[in-house]
Amino acid sequence: MNTIQINPADNVIVALSPLAKGTAVAVPGVGEVVAAEDIPQGHKMAVRAIAAGEDVVKYGLPIGHVMGDIQPGQWLHTHNVKTNLSGEVEYAYNPTHPVVEPVEPETFMGFRRADGRAATRNELWIIPTVGCVNEVARAMCEQAQDLVEGSLEGVYYFPHPFGCSQTGADHAQTRRLLVALSRHANAAGVLFLSLGCENCTHQQVLDELGDFDRERVRFLACQDVADEQVEGHKILSELADLAKQAKREPIPASELVIGLKCGGSDGLSGITANPTIGRVSDMVVARGGTSVLTEVPEMFGAESILLDRCESQDVFNAAADMLNGFKDYFISHGEVVYENPSPGNKDGGITTLEDKSCGCVQKGGSAPIVDVLPYAGQATKHGLNMLCGPGNDMVSTTALTAAGCHVILFSTGRGTPFGAPAPTLKVFTNQRLCDHKANWMDFNAGVVATGERTLDEAAHDLYQLVLETASGKLTSAERRGCHEISIWKDGVCL
């Protein structure tokens, strides 16, 4: 199999491997179609005549329209296809009420926190409240590596440039994100490291935290002590003693929270990796667990796939408001809503934002959507959640971590080395990338395109890897020491 027609209603097929000019392809319901030109892997070929202005249909949905008459066998891409997207949309709620049959959950070997939550890692996190102390945090983290022993699995710091010279909602958003990170169950202990004179004050962080475990969350203002390294190591040593009391134990998979993300997508993302991840999401939800889908701009053009699965009118209204609110965000900055596909996306076969979005939302599987979370919000309802956040890889995976995700499933057709604070599994879309960047890979979904595994079989394999990762198996990014954050900024710099 070297091509696929994703939906019987599609007027295109996708090349699973490079298709040479003159190659004949049998298309169900159409007959034989001969490639009129070379079709790169992941790219689209017309299987029917399409008149100028008519829609290109893929995934059973329009992904744009052709700019001129198209004949069967022609290559369809950015040179002859244009988006249909514009601004806000008045969405209608047409509920489908999908049902996920419950399944008895397996267990993974995790940590049980004092407040009853489950964790997949047992770490200490140093969170700077301002960029001025990033290097202090780095030195403090390096000095604290001697504390990593027994059940304490790591000490990490998360540098960023913010926390000062911000105002209003932008400043509040940074503060909420940092506090949300501190609540993550994988952090057995947290040190908020401040300078002492920044806008993101100690009192503001305390107010944002509300009621919290004062043994687990500690503070240090560098301007208040003679030697911040000595004081910092003392605090981290105390947190390490607390963390080492935790031991791995069996925990039901119903307590897992997984994040769903894609980056560096290609034309196979929506055919191999993303639907595999979507099936894993459904498996987690069926076991009583939680999954979180973000990247709002990469839902544009595929909204109905998600909105019709909202479990209630209230959830639908919140989702519709989030989608249109994000479009307003673009427009308020003088940007059009559809300029999303990157050069790498286009090189891999993604033509329009609708094309990208229809593939992106495959990660959400088929479960009902139970809640809509703001940026820096935490998932509290079991089932599939939507999270407000941009498409940017590091910003959105940071938001997924802040939402409480224990493991993040990250599909990519181009490859990327980074890792979020939460374990980040890289799911590759194609065999070529697996061969080229094996050191970045955790799971090869390219086996779906080659026919070695079905989607269901690949999903079973990936789900087992999720359980192993939750039980302590390191991801590729963790093995390479990648633990990074990026904060969504939307405001002036003083």
Model-derived segments and their meaning:
Residues 1-407, 414-417, 422-494:
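Metallocofactor- and cofactor-centric catalytic cores in central/energy metabolism, strongly enriched
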